[in-house]
Each structure stands twice: as structure tokens, then as C-alpha cells.
Amino acid sequence: MSLPALPVWNWTTLSLLLLLAVWQDLAHRRIPNPLLLCTASAALVLAAMPQGIGLVSSLAAALVAGGAFLPLYLLGQMGAGDIKLMATAGLLVGMPRALALCLSVAMAGGLLALGWAWQTRKPQSASARTANRMPYAVAVALGSAWHGLLTLPFP
């Protein structure tokens, strides 16, 4: 099954979002709400354009992508910014790409988590675990890049 082509502006916007989110997550362990809100607004405008992916597809993908990782937030394993980042990425990729994106991000996150656990394998208190939480924006970026490489039509 091949996925429908995604407009170049969506890939460009997603790439810029992920670069800025990774930078902020690594530097401050936060993904700023204004970044996500501006990108979500741009994603909705892109979706509504005649060549866009469609508002219904975009909104459904945001629910799928954000909802897929919501249990990890509820268990305290991810931050709210990571969930909002996934939902915003969903707005940009639409359905059915959001399903493949979630799988790619989950696999990248699992591999990064193994490396993170190996690096920080000393026993820690609960407060130290919170301060030493893995910046999941990196996993979202790597998973998105992997997804893009697997699904982009190359000549």
C-alpha cells in the first residue's frame, strides 16, 4: 500500500518544527507552547488549501498521533509538550500517515530509551529521574525522518 503524496510545504513545516523542538527540548527540557500553537495554525491553513491534505484528515491525524502517546503521559513517562508535539506533527501529515508516523516514532523512542537507560544506569531517586528524563522530541524527530525516508517517492 502506498501513501498519498504529502505536499512539500507540510514536510518543510514539520522539519522546521522538529528542529526547533529538539533544540528547545535538549536545551531546556521544554517544548514551548507558542511554537506548537503557531505550527498548528500553519498546519490547519496548509490542510485547508486546495492542494492540502484536508481539514478532516489533519484533525483526525492529530487525535490519533496525540492519543497514541497519551497513555505514556498519564503514566508519567512523557511530558505534555511531547504529546502536543505529536498532535501537531499529526496535523501536518494527515491520515493515514499518522499511523505509520506513530509506529516510526515509537520505534525510534524505544531505541533511544535503551541508549538513555544504558547511559544513566545508576540507581536514582524519583526527583533525579524526573530531572534526567529523556528528551522525547529527539525520538519524534528521528522517527519522523525515518518515516519520511520510507514513504517519500524517490525517483
Question: What residues fall within each predicted segment?
Answer:
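A membrane-topology feature that recognizes alpha-helical transmembrane segments
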Residues: M1-P155
